Amino acid sequence: MSGRIRKAVAPVYLLLCLVLGGSAQGIWANAFLQVTAIAIIAWAAVDGREIGLPPRARQLTIIGALGLLLVALQFVPLPPALWTALPGRSLVLEGFAILGLEPGWMPLSLTPYDGLATAAALLPPVAMLVAVIKLGCRSPWLALAVVGATAAAVMLGALQVAGVASAESPWYFYERSNFGVATGFFANSNHMATLLLVAIPFVAALGATASRWTDDARKRAAAMAIVAGALLLIAVGLALNGSLAGYGLALPVAVASLLLIVRPRGAVVRSAALALGFVGAVMFVQLLASPLNERFVGAGAATSISSRQALTAGSVQAWEAFGPGGSGLGSYSEVYRLLESPSQVNTTFVNHAHNDYLELAIELGLPGILLMLLFLAWWGATAWQVGRSQAFDQYAQAGVIASGAILVHSAVDFPLRTAAIGALFAASLALMIVSKRRVDGKADLRPTRHLVIH
């Protein structure tokens, strides 16, 4: 019984994150998820079972430890002679001068309280990694949690579109949201689109599992019909959602996911499909780099800038101002407002760079850039291993597609800033590491090379 409970922790917690962690506006919901994350991590720490970590898990642990060290250094008090020499601190010194105060010891982060809040938001993804890798779980259960939450989100989205397009609607969970379109359990329609996209490879993985359970043609056809129905539901969700992110990434994600079911034998076919996915991803990034379309963002969501290029230019200016030292974790919105042109200021404000890589570079400086490159190298090597080795199953491959879609989307948005997508990303990474085929012997890991005569 205890083993079943332990294996249910990851899918149940993932489901909770997907339902409750759709926005930072949900203060109490996020606090509950963070406290639960601490409990999961503590459980894993006292679990007496001896489980050897796979090499990829050990590597990811090292990267995570480096990230934790970098975050901790943000809050270490520095003497005035040191922190005043860092780029971008002249504005802080001016503030001390206006108040007639002598500068004292201060941390590297310009907004340490925001940094602590951002660090606490990392607890759900860490707990998800620990739950899958240390406590263990069944891969299909995780996939079912993703697909189930997505189906519920689409149905909720249909009610949102059919109802009042304002905060007065009972179907929108957050006061500030993209009203008039399907946001599901999220405040941002782009983050709902991320969930819809990530659900596609997990639907395909479940379909591949169901089709291999039996040789009965009718049962296989029924399984494929269920898969087709689930994919149709996701397509409806994308239409109701109206996000450019969903439209731009749908084709490459769908093509890559199709390989989990069809599994073409020819290397040329597989390479062509992967090339199509790559081209689609590039087109997606190029599309979202164009000026914002008011039809998609809506007048209520308009920011004080008119295009992503202008936002990127302002973010680059922030990088130039704070240089290799960084401004501190969670400080982007405050830093941007310090440097924003008065002519562009109105009743709305920029809260994120809509490019998580650039935002982290501004906040964490050169060490953050190096850490991101190290993680991306790890992800690429792990994805390559999953694609080349027959030891990994369709859920590990679905994890590659899902995490890849999130990484691409993060170049033009900030989906990982929510507990929901953060936990989903962590679950995908964990599947890339531990989800393997069940085999009876080494011979099952490679194609049979001899003729069997019955």
Region locations from a protein language model:
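Alpha-helical transmembrane segments of multi-pass inner-membrane proteins
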Residues: 2-20, 30, 34-43, 68, ...
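Helix-to-loop transition at the C-terminal end of transmembrane segments
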Residues: 24-28, 75-86, 158-169, 287-297, ...
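Flexible juxtamembrane loops connecting transmembrane helices in multi-pass membrane enzymes
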Residues: 181-182, 250, 254, 282-320
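Short aromatic-rich membrane-water interface segments that cap or initiate transmembrane helices
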Residues: 89-119, 177-193, 304-307, 352-360
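TM-adjacent membrane-interface loops and short helices in multi-pass inner/ER membrane proteins
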Residues: 74, 188, 309-350, 364-371
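Short, intrinsically disordered terminal tails adjacent to the first/last structured region
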Residues: 1, 316, 437-454
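Peri-membrane helix termini and adjoining interfacial loops of integral membrane proteins
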Residues: 85-103, 165-177, 291, 337-345
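N-terminal hydrophobic segments of proteins, predominantly signal-anchor/transmembrane helices
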Residues: 8-23, 43-124
